[in-house]
């Protein structure tokens, strides 16, 4: 579970009340990036997670940043979340924010087949920019409240995520379904990845016995 304070810098978007990120608790800082095609609900998911508010109007994002201080699995963390553009005309900006991200929420809409096709390209681009075979990424099928308009089967998305070593959530920003869970799972994936990336600790030097230098008898 997570809890904590939040703030945002999105233009024309509601700002959360309460304390800001000026004095984060001791712990971790993770840069999370929300990516996906245009109109899939990236901003709605982000604002629902940050401010518990559903944005119903589609307002194309260029780039908005938010901060949330929360606790995941008992460990405090500051999450710097970047909500990115999905439109093709802003595609040149993608590599810049991909370089900075510690983890990615890869979003499509279950009622938009094209948006699902696009996540494969974004996944490949993330790994290329990071020069890694694996990276912390969580796949989210948003707009689960539009089941009667579904174009992407749950089994298809689950199979894709499993083959690419991602956790998959079907979420609804409108119903606040699996919103917190997706972000929390991404934090866990980032932690696990960073632990694996840490260099091994150097072997500790053997302790010398009291009584001076060791001697060799001839």
Swiss-Prot record:
S-palmitoylated by ZDHHC19, leading to increased association with membranes and with rafts/caveolae as well as enhanced cell viability. GTP binds at residues 36-44, 83-87, 142-145, 172-174. It is found in: Cell membrane. Keywords: Cell membrane, GTP-binding, Hydrolase, Lipoprotein, Membrane, Methylation, Nucleotide-binding, Palmitate, Prenylation. A lipid is attached at residue 215 (S-geranylgeranyl cysteine). Its main location: membrane. It is a lipid-anchor. Its EC number is 3.6.5.2. Residues 7-20 have a biased composition (Gly residues). GTP-binding protein with GTPase activity, likely involved in the regulation of MAPK signaling pathway and thereby controlling multiple cellular processes. Regulates the organization of the actin cytoskeleton. With OSPBL3, modulates integrin beta-1 (ITGB1) activity. Interacts with PLCE1. Interacts (active GTP-bound form preferentially) with RGS14. Interacts with OSBPL3. Interacts with ZDHHC19. Belongs to the small GTPase superfamily. Ras family. This is Ras-related protein R-Ras. It comes from Mus musculus (Mouse).
């Amino acid at each position: 579970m997570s809890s904590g304070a939040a703030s945002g810098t999105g233009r024309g978007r509601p700002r959360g009340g309460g304390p800001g990120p000026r004095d984060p608790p001791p712990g971790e800082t993770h840069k999370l990036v929300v990516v996906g095609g245009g109109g899939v609900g990236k901003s709605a998911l982000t604002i629902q997670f940050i401010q518990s508010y559903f944005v119903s109007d589609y307002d194309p994002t260029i780039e908005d940043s938010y901060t949330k201080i929360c606790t995941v699995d008992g460990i405090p963390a500051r999450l710097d979340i970047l909500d990115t553009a999905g439109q093709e005309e802003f595609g040149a900006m993608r590599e810049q924010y991909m370089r900075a991200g510690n983890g990615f929420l890869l979003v499509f809409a279950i009622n938009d087949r094209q948006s699902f096709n696009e996540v494969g390209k974004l996944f490949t681009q993330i790994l290329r920019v990071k020069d890694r075979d694996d990276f912390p990424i969580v796949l989210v099928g948003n707009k689960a409240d539009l089941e009667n308009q579904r174009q992407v089967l749950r089994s298809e998305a689950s199979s894709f995520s499993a083959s690419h070593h991602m956790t998959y959530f079907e979420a609804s920003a409108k119903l606040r379904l699996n919103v917190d869970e997706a972000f929390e799972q991404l934090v866990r994936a980032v932690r696990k990845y960073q632990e694996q990336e840490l260099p091994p600790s150097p072997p500790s030097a053997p302790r010398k016995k009291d009584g001076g230098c060791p001697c060799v008898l001839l």
